[in-house]
Curated annotation (Swiss-Prot):
<comment type="function">
    <text>DMATS-type prenyltransferase; part of the fragmented gene cluster that mediates the biosynthesis of fusarochromene, a tryptophan-derived metabolite closely related to a group of mycotoxins including fusarochromanone. Within the pathway, fscG catalyzes the prenylation of the primary alcohol produced by fscA which is necessary for the formation of the chromene ring by the oxidoreductase fscI. The first step of the pathway is the epimerization of L-tryptophan to D-tryptophan in the presence of the NRPS-like tryptophan epimerase fscC.</text>
</comment>
<feature type="binding site">
    <location>
        <position position="423"/>
    </location>
    <ligand>
        <name>dimethylallyl diphosphate</name>
    </ligand>
</feature>
<dbReference type="InterPro" id="IPR012148">
    <property type="entry name" value="DMATS-type_fun"/>
</dbReference>
<feature type="binding site">
    <location>
        <position position="261"/>
    </location>
    <ligand>
        <name>dimethylallyl diphosphate</name>
    </ligand>
</feature>
<comment type="pathway">
    <text>Secondary metabolite biosynthesis.</text>
</comment>
<dbReference type="GO" id="GO:0009820">
    <property type="term" value="P:alkaloid metabolic process"/>
</dbReference>
<keyword id="KW-0808">Transferase</keyword>
<protein>
    <recommendedName>
        <fullName>DMATS-type prenyltransferase fscG</fullName>
        <ecNumber>2.5.1.-</ecNumber>
    </recommendedName>
</protein>
<feature type="binding site">
    <location>
        <position position="259"/>
    </location>
    <ligand>
        <name>dimethylallyl diphosphate</name>
    </ligand>
</feature>
<dbReference type="Pfam" id="PF11991">
    <property type="entry name" value="Trp_DMAT"/>
</dbReference>
<feature type="binding site">
    <location>
        <position position="193"/>
    </location>
    <ligand>
        <name>dimethylallyl diphosphate</name>
    </ligand>
</feature>
<feature type="binding site">
    <location>
        <position position="352"/>
    </location>
    <ligand>
        <name>dimethylallyl diphosphate</name>
    </ligand>
</feature>
<feature type="binding site">
    <location>
        <position position="263"/>
    </location>
    <ligand>
        <name>dimethylallyl diphosphate</name>
    </ligand>
</feature>
<dbReference type="GO" id="GO:0004659">
    <property type="term" value="F:prenyltransferase activity"/>
</dbReference>
<comment type="similarity">
    <text>Belongs to the tryptophan dimethylallyltransferase family.</text>
</comment>
<feature type="binding site">
    <location>
        <position position="195"/>
    </location>
    <ligand>
        <name>dimethylallyl diphosphate</name>
    </ligand>
</feature>
<dbReference type="InterPro" id="IPR033964">
    <property type="entry name" value="Aro_prenylTrfase"/>
</dbReference>
Length: 435
């Protein structure tokens, strides 16, 4: 057999190495493939995804996603006019990974979120970064992703005015709209999620309000009970009134099966404030065990040597680096989302703890989480997670200041356990990244 056409496999996860033999090294997306492709494949490999699923993730990424994130402009300054700065991460990287932890009988789920970036993104032609996202969903994915339904996507694009070509405010400092898209590779296929960050209120130039989101949401809900309960909490509860709305997300599936997720944030970080929001001021009941589990998890993940105080605010362990892509801190507030299902009377609530601020280090957060998982017989994949984290972080020299783990997300489960997800920023645009 003539082997003169064979290629040497690049080093990396096996599925990625094999696929890389046939990737055009001169393609615009090749640098993204080298970084993001290898890291996503490693996460899937360590989560013990079947090899065929790993190839599916890689093919989907290469064929559908990478062409919509623009070139990797490594080496340019953050404010370079040729480089759009994504709001997804603190260094402007338009990718974020997540690892949803297993329970005692399941395996982890790997997801990732992107901000689509085109040649006109951020310009007067596309001030709200709509065009590339719209192309990705309607041109690239609508015809090939089974079960994809863009009904709610189109509704909220129009409701928030994201498809407009004219700024809602003449104030250059007014909030700009942004859109993110996330992909969850489930056992059969992929679930697509869309995220909406509305622009400034028309006329006022101020940030969007709860009414901004409520007005848009009522247009698709026949049953507004869960939405109304959420709005009542933020208007009338002592802890709720400090919450501000940030973002809305939807699953791009049949609206009868979809969910609305309203993201909110607050400067309050005490355990009492967390419990208040997670229970909607006591309206969500039968979560006493979950609250105790959350207290234990926080003690481990945040490196507390004494029990968590109910009333004291959490101590900031890592301060905001003003030298990165944004002049404001993406991780300076405790974040939650209200999961509003069309058939529910109350929302489910998920907490996002910015461990990048309140955890001592990546090593400390991951090790503390591992201690908790071992106590609950859920640590079967922790060693793999640590290997993946070490590999992703290998490009950042020790002392670089880049923190991989951004959030630890937690939700109460019906059996009293916790649903836990770790979020990871690969830090592609961090100044110290090698390669």
């Amino acid at each position: 057999m003539n082997d003169t056409t064979s290629k040497e496999c690049p080093s990396g996860p096996s599925a990625w190495s094999i696929a890389s033999q046939w990737v055009d090294p001169g393609a615009q997306s090749a640098p993204w493939w080298k970084l993001i492709g290898s890291q996503l494949c490693l996460l899937a490999q360590e989560a013990r995804y079947p090899i065929e699923k790993q190839f599916e993730i890689l093919l989907f990424l290469y064929a559908k996603v990478l062409p919509r994130v623009g070139p990797l402009n490594k080496g340019e300054k953050f404010n370079s006019p040729s480089r759009y700065t994504s709001l997804l991460t603190d260094d402007g990287t338009p990718f974020e990974y997540s690892w949803k932890w297993n329970n005692s009988t399941s395996s982890p789920d790997i997801r990732y979120c992107i901000e689509a970036i085109g040649s006109h993104t951020g310009s007067s032609t596309d001030p709200y970064n709509y065009l590339e996202t719209e192309k990705l969903l309607t041109q690239d994915l609508a015809s090939c992703v089974p079960g994809l339904d863009l009904t709610w996507f189109h509704h909220f694009v129009k409701a928030f005015g994201i498809d407009q070509r004219q700024m809602a405010s003449n104030n250059p400092d007014a909030p700009k709209a942004n859109m993110f898209v996330a992909f969850e590779h489930v056992q059969k296929g992929v679930v697509v999620k869309a995220y909406f960050l509305p622009a400034a209120e028309a006329g006022s130039g101020g940030p969007p309000t709860f009414e901004t989101f409520a007005s848009a949401t009522r247009g698709v809900l026949n049953n507004t009970a869960a939405l109304d309960a959420s709005l009542d909490f933020v208007k009338n509860n002592e802890m709720g009134i400090d919450l501000v709305p940030d973002m809305l997300a939807v699953d791009c599936v049949d609206p009868n099966k979809s969910r609305l997720k309203l993201y909110v944030s607050t400067t309050a970080t005490s355990f009492a404030s967390i419990v208040s929001v997670m229970t909607l001021g006591g309206k969500i009941t039968d979560v006493d065990r979950g609250i105790k589990e959350l207290e234990v998890l926080l003690s481990f993940a945040l490196g507390k040597e004494t029990p968590i105080s109910r009333d004291d605010e959490l101590n900031v362990q890592s301060v905001f680096d003003k030298g990165l892509a944004h002049d404001f801190d993406l991780y300076g507030r405790m974040t939650y989302y209200f999961d509003i299902a069309p058939s529910s009377k109350l929302p489910d609530v998920k907490l996002y703890i910015p461990v990048i601020r309140f955890g001592r280090s990546d090593e400390a957060v991951a090790s503390g989480l591992g201690q908790y998982l071992r106590l609950r017989q859920r640590d079967q994949f922790h060693d793999g997670f640590m290997r993946a984290l070490g590999s992703i972080g290998a490009g950042h020299p020790e002392g670089s200041g880049h923190r991989l783990q951004t959030y630890l997300a937690v939700a109460f489960q019906r059996d009293g356990s916790l649903a836990i997800t770790s979020y990871i920023n690969p830090g592609v645009y961090h100044d110290d990244l090698k390669g």
